[in-house]
């Protein structure tokens, strides 16, 4: 782990920068989102989208996906070497929705990737601006986190579907860099490592030769990223064991699953950032806002303020509830899929309900869905208060590892207890404490047994009025301590499958 002196904030990771002071960070993050906004405005001109169509979140997602696809070097190379029927490796596109005679029409567009790259670079002072691309990836990832359950993926790797609160960022592409690694949950990292180990078990050449050497480096790097998320010495020591294993196999998979379970109570530090759809930045740029001059932060008041003044629309299917669609997007914008619903509801100023009670499907519309019956409505993305985002995991100081309900990875730095079903979690830890990691396992189990669901996390931290931009008067909410609020609890959400 880098020593404290060289640790970069996640804005620095986000913008690929070295250590900067707060003003420089705000400026470089501002430059990044401003570039996204300028690109979006230009794309709306290219595609002849009117104001309303440009504010449609489905159009925003198509445009975002086009630029991500245009810059996906590895996939572009693969497509050129493996020409498949009907896929032009040099082109990218997707559905654009336009309003015609009071109805929504779907129009499939196709663009040259190099043309898209040209527009993107032009909007970003001639640079590739990989930070902006990563930012868009994280927004898509946060949207997936709020929309889908990863039960099937968890079960496939031998994990328990109730560990879904550890799965933040599970759909992020590998190329998402340091900013992407910062927002990945413990479960996501464990799952990536298990997949890798399984390949090594099934394919004996996986760790061999020149390629195997690169694979090994990637494996150790992922282990280090995961180790850096853990906050207790025993968990980190177990990660060292996994990383140093000569020939990773089932013992390592066991250790990793054990660690993932332990993270339900001894939570890892996972970053949270508000990444908004490109059209939101586009709206601000079009109205003359200068992000770079004003500065911007992904973890403070700025995204809340931006959403207070942005009107974004969404297509709505016939039996969907627009308020529920709004909740889904609000959660995605604030990276709050795994936050306690009591906290989210308080900040939003409207009840945030569990996924299973939402009458809405995902935001994206499949190509075979009937447009005749599609309507559109305004997304309500405003909030009553704002709060600072956290990456601490909310562990209380006395044990640096506190109570965490099956299913909370706190997003906001707001005082509350983190209720959890100790019986449910501890049941998973019966027996197996032998083998080379026995002392660490025993130590981890002891810490978990000492964690109390009523312990208060984020002591003294509160939410702020939207007029309080300097965060001077924290309002500390009081929550019903017994009532837990988990979003995917008892759920029937759709699966995310690529």
Swiss-Prot record:
Gene Ontology molecular function: RNA binding; structural molecule activity
InterPro entries in UniProt: Flu_NP
Post-translational modifications reported in the UniProt record: Late in virus-infected cells, may be cleaved from a 56-kDa protein to a 53-kDa protein by a cellular caspase. This cleavage might be a marker for the onset of apoptosis in infected cells or have a specific function in virus host interaction.
Spans annotated as Disordered: 1-21
Keyword RNA-binding attached: yes
Motif (Unconventional nuclear localization signal): 1-18
A Gene Ontology BP annotation from the UniProt entry: viral penetration into host nucleus
Example of a GO cellular component annotation carried by this entry: helical viral capsid
Motif (Bipartite nuclear localization signal): 198-216
Pfam families, sorted: Flu_NP
Source superkingdom: Viruses
Keywords for the protein's UniProt record, in alphabetical order: Capsid protein, Helical capsid protein, Host nucleus, Host-virus interaction, Ribonucleoprotein, RNA-binding, Viral nucleoprotein, Viral penetration into host nucleus, Virion, Virus entry into host cell
Location of this chain's protein in the cell: Virion; Host nucleus
Main location: virion
Role description: Encapsidates the negative strand viral RNA, protecting it from nucleases. The encapsidated genomic RNA is termed the ribonucleoprotein (RNP) and serves as template for transcription and replication. The RNP needs to be localized in the host nucleus to start an infectious cycle, but is too large to diffuse through the nuclear pore complex. NP comprises at least 2 nuclear localization signals that are responsible for the active RNP import into the nucleus through cellular importin alpha/beta pathway.
UniProt family annotation: Belongs to the influenza viruses nucleoprotein family.
Quaternary state and interactors: Homomultimerizes to form the nucleocapsid. May bind host exportin-1/XPO1. Binds to viral genomic RNA. Protein-RNA contacts are mediated by a combination of electrostatic interactions between positively charged residues and the phosphate backbone and planar interactions between aromatic side chains and bases.
Protein name (record): Nucleoprotein
Source taxonomy: Viruses, Riboviria, Orthornavirae, Negarnaviricota, Polyploviricotina
